[in-house]
């Protein structure tokens, strides 16, 4: 059942406003200020103001309304979206070589998100707290400490979940967007001339007049669409129609009115460039506006944090990151999770960024490379889906791709100018995450191939054991097996060293499907291999967390009775050593060993009682 059917359309649309549009909805705090603050050599003059407003408006129309909401959101995997989902869809009907290239693109896009996610909470919260400079200039030195305090509280409450406070997100963000619209409309009424900037010719005129500098200035304009990936990534939570409805009825009109309201203010009072957003408000409204802005930026940060939790779980389940502890914070909503390691690593990174950059304007210089890089990759992957999966005409798809790249590539190229002034930060973080994900995936594959190269037949071994059985002991033994037709290492070593076997043996494989969820009817497949051997294959989607107790329950319904506290679980524990390698592969091998040592152990990963687990060690050279 789709999300839209579970709740009323107004309720789910309101919820989408509260979660999906937090990042892009707080962009008016700093976007126009960064465009006209003087770093590009523009004065606060009519042509520049009109040019930037026209660029911002048409970027919102083309990138958000047309590209993402109309085209990209057509590509879903059982209703789910996101860059890794797009990667999976794009690789379904392509050659092995093309699939490898698409996987690399998807991983780069996911890595870019990790780079961006460190900046979003910092720049959002700091931009709101900087409103203190207008209310009380003497509190300027408190901006960094207050930003850290706000974000510390936010990261501390993650372990308790956001179900309770999450109910407040939607009304707060709706209030925020109404305030954006109201402040902007008030200023536009005082200077309606600014509406001329709706004409796209002002954007064209801007490029013709300012030439090279106007191209570099695109690096600031792109701040208006940061968070656009959230529209696609959160599609599974809210559905396509509510997200589209929220955009066209509330978010887009509010953003447009506020940006144009800031422009109208600057045309009348160029000195307002120091903080045009807060100076839109009358003096009596500054403190309430500061409070609601702080709340809105916290909500925007929460959406990003939840997004990185979801992406991490997906990467873990698809085998691109090592297993780690994932805590469900809601019994009702499977999407509400908490990952302690990711939470505190992200917190430390955000605090370091705030202390290092000190002001949101400095952070704006680091923002944009990851966003626009992901946009380029999304264009390529989504058009691949259109051609390979939807079988659209190749010439039509080529035209769409060219149109998208004509916008994406200039935006990305313009942001490369920020490389030395802060753009290195998201690129560096993204590079680290890309290396980690590709290392874990490739080295894990190498390890499994090494472990399975003995080539013994499972069926032949079972037949031999039934014909000449070893000593049988009462009870049930479960051997965890990564591959279906391969003899588990733990079974081989148990027979080799202990020379005994339980009366009933279950070979259990937990498999991740290329889908977010697996229906309970398809959850468990049971096959009796011999009078005393059973094979159980349990399938899970990448948004689900495997649970052995649930598997046993499903087995009981299928006629294979299993009791957790009467079963022994045999698992292999590999002690890894590096073989001879070139120096660069040796470095990758050492990184894998580090990741392996810190990975969540299988008993904890599958929630198996520790006193029911027997681990058999083996040394493997990789």
Swiss-Prot record:
Q: Where are the transmembrane segments?
A: 9-29, 49-69, 103-123, 137-157, 165-185, 213-233, 247-267, 276-296, 337-357, 363-383, 396-416, 419-439
Instruction: Give one GO term, molecular function aspect.
Output: symporter activity
This protein's UniProt keywords: Cell inner membrane, Cell membrane, Ion transport, Membrane, Potassium, Potassium transport, Symport, Transmembrane, Transmembrane helix, Transport
> Where can this protein be found?
Cell inner membrane
* Cell inner membrane recorded as keyword: yes
**Keyword check for Cell inner membrane:** yes
What cellular component terms from Gene Ontology apply here?
Answer: plasma membrane
According to its record, how does it sit in the membrane? Answer: Multi-pass membrane protein
Instruction: Tell me what reaction this enzyme catalyses.
Output: K(+)(in) + H(+)(in) = K(+)(out) + H(+)(out)
> Hey, which family's this protein in?
Belongs to the HAK/KUP transporter (TC 2.A.72) family.
NCBIfam families reported in the protein's UniProt record: kup, PRK10745.1
Give a short account of what the protein does: Responsible for the low-affinity transport of potassium into the cell. Likely operates as a K(+):H(+) symporter.
Annotated protein name in UniProt: Low affinity potassium transport system protein Kup
Q: What is the lineage of its organism?
A: Bacteria, Pseudomonadati, Pseudomonadota, Gammaproteobacteria, Enterobacterales
């Amino acid at each position: 059942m789709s999300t839209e059917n579970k709740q009323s359309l107004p309720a789910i649309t309101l919820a989408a406003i509260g979660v999906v549009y937090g990042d892009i909805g707080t962009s008016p705090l700093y976007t126009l200020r960064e465009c006209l603050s003087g770093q590009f050599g523009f004065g606060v003059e009519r042509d520049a103001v009109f040019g930037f407003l026209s660029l911002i408006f048409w970027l919102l129309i083309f990138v958000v309304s047309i590209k993402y909401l109309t085209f990209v959101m057509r590509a879903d995997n059982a209703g789910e979206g996101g860059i890794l989902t797009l990667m999976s869809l794009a690789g379904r009907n392509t050659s092995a070589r093309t699939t490898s290239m698409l996987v690399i693109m998807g991983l780069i896009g996911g890595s870019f998100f990790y780079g961006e996610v460190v900046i979003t909470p910092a720049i959002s919260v700091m931009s709101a707290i900087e409103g203190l400079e207008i209310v009380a200039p003497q509190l300027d030195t408190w901006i960094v400490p207050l930003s850290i305090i706000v974000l510390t509280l936010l990261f501390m409450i993650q372990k308790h979940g956001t179900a309770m406070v999450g109910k407040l997100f939607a009304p707060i963000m709706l209030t925020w967007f109404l305030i954006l619209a109201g402040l902007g409309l008030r200023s536009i009424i005082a200077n309606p001339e600014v509406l001329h900037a709706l004409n796209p010719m002002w954007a064209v005129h801007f490029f013709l007049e300012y030439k090279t500098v106007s191209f570099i200035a695109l690096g600031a304009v792109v701040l208006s669409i940061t968070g656009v990936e959230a529209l696609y990534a959160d599609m599974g939570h809210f559905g396509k129609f509510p997200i589209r409805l929220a955009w066209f009825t509330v978010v887009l009109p509010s953003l447009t009115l506020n940006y144009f309201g800031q422009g109208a203010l600057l045309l009348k009072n160029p000195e307002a460039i120091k903080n045009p957003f807060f100076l839109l408000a009358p003096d009596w409204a500054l403190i309430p506006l500061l409070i609601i802005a702080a709340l809105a930026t916290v909500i925007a940060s929460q959406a990003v944090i939840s997004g990185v939790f979801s992406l991490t779980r997906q990467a873990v389940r698809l085998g691109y990151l090592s297993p780690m502890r994932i805590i469900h914070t809601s019994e009702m909503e499977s999407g509400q999770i908490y990952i302690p390691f990711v939470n505190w690593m992200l917190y430390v990174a955000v605090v370091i960024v705030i202390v290092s950059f000190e002001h949101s304007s400095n952070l704006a210089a680091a923002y944009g490379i990851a966003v626009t890089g992901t946009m380029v990759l999304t264009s390529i992957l989504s058009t691949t889906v259109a051609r390979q999966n939807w079988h659209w005409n190749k010439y039509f798809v080529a035209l769409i791709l060219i149109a998208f790249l004509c916008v994406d590539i200039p935006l990305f190229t313009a942001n490369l100018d920020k490389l030395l002034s802060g753009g290195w930060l998201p690129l560096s973080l993204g590079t680290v995450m890309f290396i980690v994900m590709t290392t874990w995936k490739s080295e894990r594959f190498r390890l499994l191939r090494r472990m399975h190269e003995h080539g013994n037949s499972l069926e032949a071994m079972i037949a031999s054991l039934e014909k000449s059985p070893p000593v049988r002991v009462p009870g049930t033994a479960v051997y965890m097996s990564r591959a279906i037709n391969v003899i588990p290492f733990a079974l081989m070593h148990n027979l080799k060293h202990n020379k005994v076997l339980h009366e009933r043996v279950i070979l259990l494989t937990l498999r991740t499907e290329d889908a977010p969820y697996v229906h309970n009817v398809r959850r468990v497949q049971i096959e009796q291999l011999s009078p005393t051997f059973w094979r159980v294959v349990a399938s899970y989607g990448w948004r689900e967390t495997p649970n052995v107790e649930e598997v046993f329950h499903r087995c009981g319904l299928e006629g294979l009775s299993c009791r957790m506290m009467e079963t022994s679980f045999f698992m292999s524990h590999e002690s890894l050593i590096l073989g001879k390698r070139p120096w660069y592969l040796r470095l990758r091998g050492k990184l894998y060993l580090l990741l392996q040592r810190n990975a969540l152990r299988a008993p904890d990963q599958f929630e198996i009682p520790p006193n029911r687990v027997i681990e058999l060690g083996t040394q493997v050279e990789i």
